[in-house]
From Swiss-Prot:
It catalyses: Exolytic cleavage of the (1->4)-beta-glycosidic linkage between N-acetylmuramic acid (MurNAc) and N-acetylglucosamine (GlcNAc) residues in peptidoglycan, from either the reducing or the non-reducing ends of the peptidoglycan chains, with concomitant formation of a 1,6-anhydrobond in the MurNAc residue. The gene is mltF. CDD domains: MLTF-like, PBP2_YfhD_N. Transmembrane segments: none annotated. InterPro entries: Lysozyme-like_dom_sf, MltF, Solute-binding_3/MltF_N, Transglyc_AS, Transglycosylase_SLT_dom_1. This is Membrane-bound lytic murein transglycosylase F. GO terms for biological process: cell wall macromolecule catabolic process; cell wall organization; peptidoglycan catabolic process. It comes from Hahella chejuensis (strain KCTC 2396).
Amino acid sequence: MLASACTHSWRTGRFLNRIIKSSVQTLTAAALIANLSACSRPTTLEKIEQEGALHVITRNAPTTYYEDRDGPAGFEYELAKKFSEYLGVELRLRVANDLDEAYTVLEQNYTNLAAVGLSRLAASAQSPSLRFSSEYLEIQPLVLYRNGSAKPKQLDDLIGGKLIIPAQTAQAEFLRQVKDSRLPDMDWLEAADMETSEIMRLIEEGEYEYAIVNSREYEIHKAMFPRAREAFSLMEPLQISWIFPPGEDMSLIQKADEFIKQIKDDGTLIYLQERYFGHVNQLNYVGARTYISHIKDRLPKFEPTFKQAAEKFEVDWRLLASIGYQESHWRPYATSPTGVRGLMMLTLPTAKEMNVKNRLNPEQSIFGGAGYFSRIKQRISERITEPDRTWMALAAYNVGLGHLEDARALAKAQGLDQDKWIDVKQALPLLQQKKWYVKTRYGYARGWEPVHYVQNIRRYYDVLVWMTQPSAEDGSVAQNEDAPTTGADGTTEETPAIPAPFRVTPPML
């Protein structure tokens, strides 16, 4: 009986050993398969490189993306374009109708990143699982009020008034915390389908008393809505980052951080900020209101001539119109004490050079000014690229090509880039100081004048671009996202369908 029991126990032990051994082998094989599978699965960055395309979602706004006469433009667009070039792939852009759509696309992993100009605080409040690049831009949330009404000094002053803010922003989250902690009577409307321009229009027209917007978009739009005035800063400045889908590996985020560090170190980021935001403070309240009024009342009479001259000399008509406004406020009979006359305020020598018989004739003046500007621009060094070439041509139009070249030489002597407007505009004011202008070929010049001249024209031009921006049509840059993509093996595959339609839409002004 004892022997039988021992035999049974021995057989049972052998059976259990076989089971354990088999289980261990199975688990080991499964682990090896999983490990091999993980090793063979391409990273996010590798998939982008294999496809040859970076997929980015953005929104239509002056600080992010818009369609200009020459195609796509905007700070976030430029940044994304440079990142795609850094990766050596094509940029494929989608334009979301609203932030809800952008978040949906991110969460469903239909894009590689979102460049929508939002802070980490705002995006995290909507979806905690989203991930972010390092910061590359700072914005300040501002409280606005309508000029002519009492200026609020603190949040308590907004209680009882009509307040509107953009939805899904850090400002909205901040107000909810304030309401819960100390101001239970605070109420506001969160506008889910409005851009900053529309919100500021509501303040301009008196439909709302207060609004909260970010500083970058306020500065860009304030010339168009001059009654919408800054009251005070709502909270600490916010840092802007790119937003990445949840669940992906870190390869693309790490590459984005490398890129952001590089453009900070080499000056590219400062250059883009100067290009899109470096001139936005040039119009004060009175100047902005006057300009908007003149666009409606004076410009229509001369617009056809500006367009004809622009076509002849291959210049953007809105730039020519902006020059004309800076010179005379579109007054055809303007005359200065120094003898310059007409809508483009031509000097007598310039008029003779351009074969202008009557400087007070608007058509002759516009064609003369356009031809003269075109001639100056052609003399600017060919190695200077746009938009710096245009800004320097404007400076030379104002102060003379010789003085511009002196300023470029001074910039180079100081270790600055003589081919970048952001550096040359620092050197131009030195032409007023004897210790500097005695070293130049052409001597003294009122160097601050061309700096202000260019800044003013850039601001006038921006407003005209936004007020005359064409509606996007089929075939815009946003549509190439739905084109078949080619993989590394040469096969084509359709991009997965997006749950909601996408289109490029002009901003509401």
